[in-house]
Swiss-Prot record:
Region (G1): 23-30
Pfam (any one): AIG1
Record has Coiled coil as a keyword: yes
Name under which the protein is recorded: Immune-associated nucleotide-binding protein 7
Gene name tied to this protein: IAN7
Family: Belongs to the TRAFAC class TrmE-Era-EngA-EngB-Septin-like GTPase superfamily. AIG1/Toc34/Toc159-like paraseptin GTPase family. IAN subfamily.
Record-linked PROSITE patterns: G_AIG1
Domain AIG1-type G: start-end pairs: 14-222
Entry's induction text: Up-regulated by brassinolides. Down-regulated by 2-aminoethoxyvinylglycine (AVG), high CO(2), isoxaben, and propiconazole treatments.
Region (G2): 50-54
Ranges for region G5: 181-183
Length: 311
């Protein structure tokens, strides 16, 4: 898979904008999706049996005319999640994103400390889609009610203890960030929050000239889906018996799923390779730091330290 490309799509009443929610479990992805939709369609962690286990999608036309397709992902980037599971759900996500990805909402929480899992989210996104995906990222901070209670702005919160990698994400995503209170019952506030968030999505559309993010995997999925559709149409146009047509459709569906599985396995390998490279880079950096500390203690010259870009 290459670093990704873009697919020309105008902002029209016919083409929905695909907005993908990513982030750690418990950060409020599903609640943010519900705020965008305007009603509860995605189950949140607060409901024990309702945590998102598979990518889900829901489309809506907002009050100000945005036609959006919100894709809620499970906690794909939690540290406990396997590369196999991530890859399968990414393929599912791309299948749901007809026309490409128009925005990725990286959901963080102002209620909790930003952890290694958030940094893992960023690394995994880049490993899967390349650094160009950051051109489509909006950083969403949930827990706006907590900041209000503390009489803090988002800038106050970030100024207190903002990890370097978050600053880097915001820099690379043109500082597109927003705070949202998913618990508010104030209809005016709800509308204002959604408007502000979708304005940032519009900023992405304008900066990319209406082009959605796509990559090799997306195009392969689209090609397989189109082949399946055409084959089913061809079967329906011929005089096969109902039983025979159903059997042939089932066989083509099995082949389609097998091809998607192969794509998933390719992504899984890509993730594992990226994780291995990251581990080696961290190990090398640790070794060089240890050598530096030792040299400072015994005052011996050292060779120059090789720069190591973690992100």
């Amino acid at each position: 898979m290459n670093k990704g490309g873009a697919q020309q799509k105008g902002h029209s009443s016919k083409q929905a904008e695909n907005i993908v929610l990513v982030g750690r479990t418990g950060n409020g992805k599903s609640a943010t999706g519900n705020s965008l939709i305007g009603k509860k369609v995605f189950a949140s962690k607060a409901h024990a049996s309702g945590v998102t286990m598979k990518c889900q999608t829901h489309g809506v036309v907002t009050k100000d005319g945005h036609k959006i397709n919100v894709i809620d992902t499970p906690g794909l980037f939690d540290l406990s999640v396997s590369a196999e599971y991530i890859s399968k759900e990414i393929v599912r996500c791309l299948t749901l994103a007809e026309g490409g990805i128009h925005a990725v909402l990286l959901v963080l929480s102002a209620r909790t400390r930003i952890t290694q899992e958030e940094e893992n989210t960023l690394r995994t996104l880049q490993a899967l889609f390349g650094s160009q995906i950051l051109d489509y990222v909006v950083v969403v901070f949930t827990g706006g009610d907590v900041l209000e209670e503390c009489k803090e702005t988002l800038e106050d919160y970030l100024g207190r203890d903002c990890p370097t990698f978050i600053k880097e994400v915001m820099r690379m995503s043109s500082n597109r960030k927003v705070v949202i209170d998913n618990k508010t019952h104030d209809e005016g506030k709800k509308a204002e929050q959604v408007h502000k968030l979708l304005s940032l999505v519009d900023d992405i559309r304008r900066s990319k000239c209406g082009e959605a993010y796509t990559d090799d995997t997306y195009h392969m999925i689209k090609e397989e889906s189109e082949k399946l559709r055409k084959h089913h149409e061809e079967l329906e146009s011929k005089n096969y018996s109902e039983e025979c047509a159903a059997e042939m459709k089932n066989q083509s569906l099995i082949l389609y799923k097998e091809n998607l599985k192969q794509m998933s396995e390719q992504l899984e390998k890509k993730l594992k390779d990226a994780a291995e490279a990251q581990e080696k880079a961290l190990s090398k950096m640790t070794q060089e730091n240890n050598e530096l500390n030792l040299a400072l203690k015994i005052h011996i010259p050292l060779p120059p330290i090789t720069p190591c870009n973690i992100l």
